């Protein structure tokens, strides 16, 4: 299984 994304990806605005 894919490793959990934590912390979640942050998208720069």
Curated annotation (Swiss-Prot):
InterPro entries: Tryptophillin
Residues recorded as bearing Pyrrolidone carboxylic acid in the entry: 1
Tissue: Expressed by the skin glands.
Lineage: Eukaryota, Metazoa, Chordata, Craniata, Vertebrata
Annotated source species: Pithecopus azureus
Similarity annotation: Belongs to the frog skin active peptide (FSAP) family. Tryptophillin subfamily.
Record-level GO BP terms: defense response
Pfam families on file: Tryp_FSAP (PF08248)
Subcellular location: Secreted
Cellular component GO terms, alphabetical: extracellular region
Keyword Secreted applies: yes
Keywords: Amphibian defense peptide, Pyrrolidone carboxylic acid, Secreted
UniProt name for this protein: Tryptophyllin-T3-2
Keyword Phosphoprotein on entry: no
């Amino acid at each position: 299984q894919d490793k959990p994304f934590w912390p979640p990806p942050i998208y720069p605005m």
